[in-house]
């Protein structure tokens, strides 16, 4: 609870995450230590790094009831993405597990990660810059900057293809980090994939279907909660974490 609260400045999400994942009894003796840990960690984080939310997000368009069917479809899509992420990561890390020599793991992971980052620079790091861009961009010209320094640079018409490839390859980058001896975790990759999945879903719908307009930034935010919920099997954590992150 304290780790999640401190890293993401999200005390409520830290508390709810522990309750959902560990499924402990809802008694005062179990809740009070979690609450103290989460609040203390978040307070220290606020004091040392400031009180600003991790991601800036401005709600330009309010939610409309006519979009509910598309939100349900987004949830299904995010569920499939989270299933792919979980199973593919287990498979790739299983390959690393068969390498007994730690230097072979390091070399294999390093080569894989180097090639992926060279071809797709947004795979480097947590991907928070990409999330910030998709949550705040308002035009194709701004969204296209996600392809800067890549072989897709200058091909704005391939933005959806580029982002879908990132969805497919992010799991290999995360697995190479973890399997090679690093610590990539699954929280940040889940948020990253969710944001891209929500953006791809809404952008594809707006460009290639006759449905109602779907605000890309809103669906990117909902996608973050969707994939996080699917990967962690913790829907309430996804909701509260995204609420506190923005």
Task: List PLM regions with ranges.
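Alpha-helical transmembrane segments and immediately membrane-proximal extracytoplasmic
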Residues: 1-246
